[in-house]
Amino acid sequence: MLYRDEAIVLRTHKLGEADRIVTLLTRQRGRVRAVAKGVRRTTSRFGSRLEPFTHVDLQLAEGRNLDTITQAETLTPFSKGLGLDYDRYTAGTVMLETADRLVAEEREPSVQQFLLLVGGLRAMVAGEHAPGQVLDSYLLRSLAVAGYAPSFEHCARCGTLSAEGAHRWFNPSMGGMLCSTCRVPGSASPAPETVALLGALLAGDWAVVDPAAARNLKEASTLVAAYLAWHLERGLKSMAYVER
C-alpha cells in the first residue's frame, strides 16, 4: 500500500552497495524506518533530499518490517542553514537524536513531537536566540510531550508551592524541584534565578530567557542535560559535541 507523509530525516545508514535505511520522524505515523533504494549512486533521483535535518514530503510503500521510499520532495533543507554554524549544527544533532530516542515505538503517531522538532529546527536556523537556549527549550518541551514534564514551580513529590517563590532542591529522578521536606540525598541546589529560567525555557518565554545571566544559563543547561539523561537512561552521543 502506498501512502504520503511529511517527515524529518533523523539519521541514515548504509544498506548493501547502493541503498540506505532512513530513519524518519513523520507527521502522521511517528518514527518510521524506510529503504531508499539506489540513493548512494551519483545518478540517484533522490539527490540530497534524504540527508539528516531535511524536512521532506514523501511517498512510501508500506512493508512488513521496512517501508520503501518511492518519491521525495524537499520542503525545508535545514542542513543548509545549520551547516554554516558549528554550535547550531551540533545542537541540531542533539535534537535529532533526542527525537529518535523519545519516539521509541515505530509507526505510533506523534504529531506533537514532529511539530516540536520542525519548530525547534526552524528556530535554530533563524538565529534569533542562542543555540544552547533553543536546544534546552526543545529538550524540556520534548520531554514534556513524552510524558516526563519537569516540575519547577511545585514540589515534584508533594505538590506544594514554595512560600519563598521557588523551591531550593532539584533532583532528576524525582521529577524536578523539591521542597525541604521532600529533599533527597544528591539533590542539586540551583539559584532561584536558574529555577525561573528553567520554567521560562519550558514555556518558551524568550523575554525571560534571552537576557538571562551567563552563570544561570550554564547552570540551567547542566540541569537540563541531567534531567534528559535520567529519563533516557543513558546519555546522548551527540551531547558530547555541544558546549554546555
Curated annotation (Swiss-Prot):
UniProt keyword annotation of Membrane present: no
Q: Keywords, A to Z?
A: DNA damage, DNA recombination, DNA repair
Note the Gene3D superfamilies from the entry. Answer: Nucleic acid-binding proteins (2.40.50.140), Recombination protein O, C-terminal domain (1.20.1440.120)
What is any one GO biological process for this UniProt entry?
double-strand break repair
Is rRNA-binding found in the keyword set?
no
Q: Give start-end ranges for the coiled-coil region(s).
A: none
Classification via Pfam families: RecO_C (PF02565), RecO_N (PF11967)
Query: What is the superkingdom listed in this entry's lineage?
Result: Bacteria
Q: Name one GO cellular component term.
A: bacterial nucleoid
Biological role: Involved in DNA repair and RecF pathway recombination.
State the family named in the UniProt similarity comment for this chain.
Belongs to the RecO family.
Task: Kindly provide the name given to this protein in its UniProt entry.
Answer: DNA repair protein RecO
Q: Which organism is it from?
A: Nocardioides sp. (strain ATCC BAA-499 / JS614)
As recorded in Swiss-Prot or TrEMBL, the protein's gene is named recO
